[in-house]
Amino acid sequence: MEIIKSSRHQRIIGHFGEALLSNWLSRSGFEVTIVDHTGIDIVAYHPVTNQRLGITVKSRTRPKGKEATAVNLLSYRKSKDDRKKVFDACTAFACDPWIAVYVETTVFADIYLTSLRNYDKRYRSRNNLTTDTWKMRAKDLLLYEADPEVKHIRVEFRADSWGW
């Protein structure tokens, strides 16, 4: 089924990615709240491990042929320092900085979750770029799959009778 985005799709998909991740964290024993705060979208606390995560969530929809397009995570353009905003918010809420990426295609969606520390250590470009990205090429997906510090969920879409 072809993806035809509405004028409000980016806002809708953003909320959906946050809600889906919140659901899985809650199912995993975390106390979770979605926050409207510059820098992070979710605060999650795991009472058993005493972990408190401040998560920035990036949600994207990719049409057929664009599934491998990287997701922009943190920008440093024109005095905009998204990384500083994440760290400032995590300081305010006493939590560790994490990143989540939700990407949906015509037939499935993937959600990835890892600490910003793990991202920096294993996946962040060593070049001085204006934007940090989460790569979505096949070789990158294999790296994430092999990394125990990257949490991953795949959701399959099946639309039996959905057409307008």
Regions found by a protein language model. Name each.
Residues 1-38, 45-164:
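Mixed-charge (Asp/Glu-Lys/Arg
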